[in-house]
């Protein structure tokens, strides 16, 4: 299979590329298509907010317009999780929609990022793969978002400890250290958070803020770890 080559983008206009993620099962090859459009066109799309990854994590191939295209493993996992089994999803993803080897194009596209995130139907936050601690924390925060839980039971010592550990793990994730996070989230019309197989509603973002605020209190007062309330 040949390597991918970008079509030229018009840097004199408000043009962007969008990515069609074709439907498939979890273990199928990831197949995508790029197309050119303009920010002001009425094309429904989602914008992905995520952490690129590092060289240590390596890359994995997707099929882009019939050619091999390598992406960082974290983005690969995001595409696997976010891909639908039956419909095409359209995303704006910087690592794919911008030709990273073209400095002039990068400057042009970065200058439009606020508009790109504002125009998106929603911003999808990818926190990365889940683990046992994050599953526990996300489940608890999700319950808070739904209004079904406001405290960790005082008798549930193990639960409080696991929630504390889970929140610490979440806060240490590379995503929260990205300098673009505030701009991307501030411009979002709607927000969905994904972590592994978890896909959480917009109210989750509010609950996450409450939980992380509570985490700061716990961190300053170790005894509060045994009496943690949302």
Regions found by a protein language model. Give the residues of each.
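Conserved Walker B
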Residues: 96
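Hydrophobic "anchor" residues on beta-strands that sit immediately upstream
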Residues: 90
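Metal-ion-coordinating, acidic/His-rich active-site neighborhoods
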Residues: 2-16, 20-47, 51-71, 78-87, ...
């Amino acid at each position: 299979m040949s390597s991918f080559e970008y079509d030229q983008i018009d840097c004199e206009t408000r043009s962007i590329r969008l990515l069609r993620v074709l439907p498939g099962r979890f273990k199928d090859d990831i197949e995508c298509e790029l197309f050119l459009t303009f920010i002001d066109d009425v094309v429904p799309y989602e914008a992905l907010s995520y952490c690129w990854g590092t060289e240590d994590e390596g890359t994995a191939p997707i099929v882009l317009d019939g050619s091999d295209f390598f992406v960082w493993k974290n983005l690969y996992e995001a595409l696997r999780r976010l891909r639908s089994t039956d419909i095409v999803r359209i995303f704006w993803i910087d690592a794919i929609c911008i030709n990273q080897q073209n400095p002039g194009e990068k400057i042009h596209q970065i200058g439009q990022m606020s508009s790109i995130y504002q125009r998106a139907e929603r911003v999808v936050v990818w926190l990365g793969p889940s683990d046992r601690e994050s599953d526990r924390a996300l489940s608890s925060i999700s319950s808070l978002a739904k209004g079904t839980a406001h405290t960790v039971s005082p008798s549930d010592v193990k639960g409080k400890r696991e929630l504390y550990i889970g929140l610490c793990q979440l806060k240490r994730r590379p995503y929260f250290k990205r300098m673009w996070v505030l701009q991307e989230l501030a411009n979002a019309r709607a927000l969905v958070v994904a972590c592994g197989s978890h896909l959480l509603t917009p109210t989750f973002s509010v609950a996450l803020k409450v939980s992380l605020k509570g985490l700061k209190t716990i961190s300053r007062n170790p005894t509060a770890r045994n009496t943690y309330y949302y």
